[in-house]
UniProtKB/Swiss-Prot annotation:
Protein name, as recorded: Large ribosomal subunit protein uL6
Gene Ontology CC annotation, any one: cytosolic large ribosomal subunit
Entry similarity comment: Belongs to the universal ribosomal protein uL6 family.
GO biological process entries: cytoplasmic translation
Matches recorded under NCBIfam families: L6_bact
Functional description taken from the UniProt entry: This protein binds to the 23S rRNA, and is important in its secondary structure. It is located near the subunit interface in the base of the L7/L12 stalk, and near the tRNA binding site of the peptidyltransferase center.
GO MF annotation terms: rRNA binding; structural constituent of ribosome
Xref: Pfam families: Ribosomal_L6
Quaternary structure and partners: Part of the 50S ribosomal subunit.
HAMAP family xref list: Ribosomal_uL6_B (MF_01365_B)
PANTHER family on file: 60S/50S RIBOSOMAL PROTEIN L6/L9 (PTHR11655), LARGE RIBOSOMAL SUBUNIT PROTEIN UL6M (PTHR11655:SF14)
Source species of the chain: Bifidobacterium adolescentis (strain ATCC 15703 / DSM 20083 / NCTC 11814 / E194a)
Record InterPro entries: Ribosomal_uL6-like, Ribosomal_uL6-like_a/b-dom_sf, Ribosomal_uL6_a/b-dom, Ribosomal_uL6_bac-type, Ribosomal_uL6_CS
Amino acid sequence: MASHIGKLPVTIPAGVEVKIDGQSFTAKGAKGTDSYEIPEGITAVVEGNEVVLTPADDLRPTRAKHGLARSIVAGMVKGVHEGYAKTLEIVGTGYRAQMKGKGIEFSLGYSHTITVEPPAGIEFELPNPNQVIVKGIDKQAVGQCAANIRKLRAPEPYKGKGIKYADEHILRKAGKAGK
């Protein structure tokens, strides 16, 4: 019994160059270069325009790593080809963001402003003061950076004020009942 995800081949799109050196996997594309150390017990082979990952045995931990490695490789190939982006929306009166160099300065109702510098490989975009786009080639880094920004002022359930993902729905609570 093999991993359902792991047994699927990863298609390499045109313009993406893949190199496998032992357990080291490198993908190079229009957006940049990314590399990953494939776990022990998993071998990767390029067959035509696909990357196929195969487990050395059928033990449960190896099957789990097989699916994980395949997902990470697929994410890397997509990242260097198209890139990843997460959009955050800032909701609330007086809550806004503005570019400050490469970083962003947030006004979120605190007594001070908060400045966030982008980590390596990540860039910010501000289409308007109430919207932040986090872009990069590493899916995990983009998601983590977006989560760190959201954490600065997570949406509250009564008025929905705070920083939320563009596709996120905030569950609302009824306020206290008046007399």
